[in-house]
Amino acid sequence: MAKPSDAVRIQDTKVALSTASVYPESTATAFEIAARLGYDGVEVMVWTDPVSQDIEALRRLSDYHRMPILAVHAPCLLITQRVWSTDPWVKLQRARAAAEKLGASTVVVHPPFRWQRQYARDFVDGIWRMADETDVRFAVENMYPWRYRDREMQAYAPDWDVTKDDYRHFTIDLSHAATSRTDTLDMIDRMSDRLGHVHLADGKGSAKDEHLVPGRGNQPCAEVLERLAHTGFDGHVVIEVNTRRAMSGAEREADLAEALAFTRLHLAQTVSPVPGGPATRTDRR
């Protein structure tokens, strides 16, 4: 049993709401909901909503709702191929500039699509070069193979399993881990001290990327959060769940309130701190 003097609550781990979590509602609605429910901040998914692409509009929302922007998700999705540019490096440069201007500590990046051949060839070295030019973390996110019936397609390069390549920081997405049928805790072990950002959502291993509310699938969401608390994780935990099936605004908010309560409960477990905690590497391995 831990002594009172050993008890620790992770004060620096902020819980943010991804603006994608309110889709099909707007980016502005995400700020409003995050403030009302008591989130620590937001992660802005840059996509087809014009407000998500407008730094000054985002700054006004952040100021009005007193909701810090903790991370910017670069426009890496199929539906955002023309957002900010058709050049993937320009997208990342603009995401970095947005993060710097808005005070966000992290830019979330997906690995390239396989058909982006030159971008994929240059990606690992290019991410290192960009990371060397800023204090903003470029946290590369684990993805998954695309599946249809019994067929599997490798859609990402160098690999959907980002731990196979050398990045300074990683994002772990638990829904993506479920879709790829990967052992999440093993992946976190491979990321080690380079884990810089967490997308918290649940999944059941479906071929579809489910993004369920934590606790509604088979991912070790609680164990992951407790491990983060135990190791002194210094990044952010972002709720990135799918609420498209919500029948009303009240139902959507109830799901997002449940996700926040789950996350804070398991980050606040009483543990014995690990001396020193994890350190973030800044050199290549």
Curated annotation (Swiss-Prot):
Cleaved signal peptide residues: none
Domain of life: Bacteria
SUPFAM superfamilies: Xylose isomerase-like (SSF51658)
Pfam family of the protein (one): AP_endonuc_2
PANTHER family registered for this protein in UniProt: HYDROXYPYRUVATE ISOMERASE, PTHR12110:SF47
Family assignment from sequence similarity: To M.leprae ML2432 and M.tuberculosis Rv0498.
Protein name in the entry: Uncharacterized protein SCO3347
Biological classification of the source: Bacteria, Bacillati, Actinomycetota, Actinomycetes, Kitasatosporales
